[in-house]
Amino acid sequence: MGQVLPLVTRQGDRIAIVSGLRTPFARQATAFHGIPAVDLGKMVVGELLARSEIPAEVIEQLVFGQVVQMPEAPNIAREIVLGTGMNVHTDAYSVSRACATSFQAVANVAESLMAGTIRAGIAGGADSSSVLPIGVSKKLAHVLVDVNKARTMSQRLKLFSRLRLRDLMPVPPAVAEYSTGLRMGDTAEQMAKTYGITREQQDALAHRSHQRAAQAWSDGKLKEEVMTAFIPPYKQPLVEDNNIRGNSSLADYAKLRPAFDRKHGTVTAANSTPLTDGAAAVILMTESRAKELGLVPLGYLRSYAFTAIDVWQDMLLGPARSTPLALERAGLTMSELTLIDMHEAFAAQTLANIQLLGSERFAREVLGRAHATGEVDDSKFNVLGGSIAYGHPFAATGARMITQTLHELRRRGGGFGLVTACAAGGLGAAMVLEAE
């Protein structure tokens, strides 16, 4: 057993999460079509502050993330401060850790709280898959820079004459890993084959995710943590996530063709999370600051861990690697958890991580640990559904998971919850939460 690392300030204060909120999540090019991530971020932070009734000047720092960067607003955090009526002196900076971006934002605010430089801050993330930075070819970009330096019209025309029609075609954002050229779906296929995960198992998990998410909405469990979004042309508000298939059957999933390995694959659009637009944020404070303001925290951040592995194989095993570290730092075991919430990038990736968390061989030979992290109890796992159903606005997912888990822990009378995710680049994140 490694060292327990209590997340407390010098005065012994725990890190309290006092409030959390998100927009409804919308599939790419649907309800939030044309709404940039920065506007989604402003929307959720503005509403979060209004609902919490916390004076804006109490917030001393805002750390926010965006994975699909927009060149015109590179520091989304600062734009949110300036666009929501927050105190202009509020420190604000942006982070990016792929699909674990808002985990990183929460960790950064927590570290500021523990260092004593602030007493309250906001962490979160927003992404739009509908408003994308469409680029130009490398040759056109090179010519445009040279044209800007040219002094005469003849020099400019000569430069433009080097271009061909294909050089003028727009270039969409890459969906593959920069370092390997592999898509995340390719890695999900590799993991399905390596760990013997069948198409039927993947479809069953996806179906479970949609059923549970639909039930969560039907039972009213998400109303407190999801705002109503009013979007141009303001004819109809978006109230709920629009990706959830509440009436689907397992037979529906079986009809889809593989999306990555067309001949022999098992990963489909239905057993993967879709491209999504949305934003989410949480307010963190020292425990004493929350008491001063008369606030009852949703819960507390008990521990966190980030890991990184090679990107050529098993790139999406972040949960299997970061979870034992987070549990160790929290001084807990898997059996002591009340809830486990794992990001469902793909059903194949999710099932592989579940398998390896319970594997003694993986623990010994890969992690160098004496025993497996622990079997995942299905009754504790993704009890309200997961990212396959809700969708995945990259930078917002972590904050969604944290808020959702804390609310569910409180409904169950308290306890400990694990939230964990894989991320592009072979990254992994895990956090242990506590509610009373």
Curated annotation (Swiss-Prot):
Originating species: Shigella flexneri serotype 5b (strain 8401)
Keywords recorded for this protein, A-Z: Acyltransferase, Cytoplasm, Fatty acid metabolism, Lipid degradation, Lipid metabolism, Transferase
Its job: Catalyzes the final step of fatty acid oxidation in which acetyl-CoA is released and the CoA ester of a fatty acid two carbons shorter is formed.
E.C. numbers: 2.3.1.16
Active site (record annotation): 99 (acyl-thioester intermediate), 392 (proton acceptor), 422 (proton acceptor)
Subunit structure: Heterotetramer of two alpha chains (FadJ) and two beta chains (FadI).
A Pfam entry, by short name: Thiolase_N
InterPro entries in the cross-refs: Ac-CoA_C-AcTrfase_FadI, Thiolase, Thiolase-like, Thiolase_acyl_enz_int_AS, Thiolase_AS, Thiolase_C, Thiolase_CS, Thiolase_N
Superkingdom in the source lineage: Bacteria
Keyword Cell inner membrane included in the entry's annotation: no
GO MF annotation list: acetyl-CoA C-acyltransferase activity
Keyword field contains Lipid metabolism: yes
Pathway: Lipid metabolism; fatty acid beta-oxidation
Reactions accelerated catalytically: an acyl-CoA + acetyl-CoA = a 3-oxoacyl-CoA + CoA
Stated name of the protein: 3-ketoacyl-CoA thiolase
GO cellular component terms, semicolon-separated: cytosol
Family: Belongs to the thiolase-like superfamily. Thiolase family.
